[in-house]
Amino acid sequence: MDKNNLVNGFTNYETFTFVLWLDNDKKMHDLALDAVKTAYNKNLRLSNAIYEIQSFLETYLHQNIHDNFTDFYRDMIVNSINKINTYEVAKHLFHNYVENYQIEQKTA
């Protein structure tokens, strides 16, 4: 991937926007953090932990598409959601959690 085409370090605008919302919306942040903690506490291989978080994110995204969006708007919303690189987001969340957890352990 050409690093010049990244949006603030992420694959695309949709992925970057999703990460912003995860970081700034308490409910979304807490749900994602719970998924990350669960994967981390299972002592899974890194790839399996990231896959588990990615699965959670994909389910979350698609479960929250409201049925009142129909036709054109639903198609546009689903298309944008499908552009989100959930693997990249899961990896980002996991690495941030591990980094913060290690910092907490050092200061405790």
Protein language model regions, located:
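Acidic interaction surfaces
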Residues: 1-108
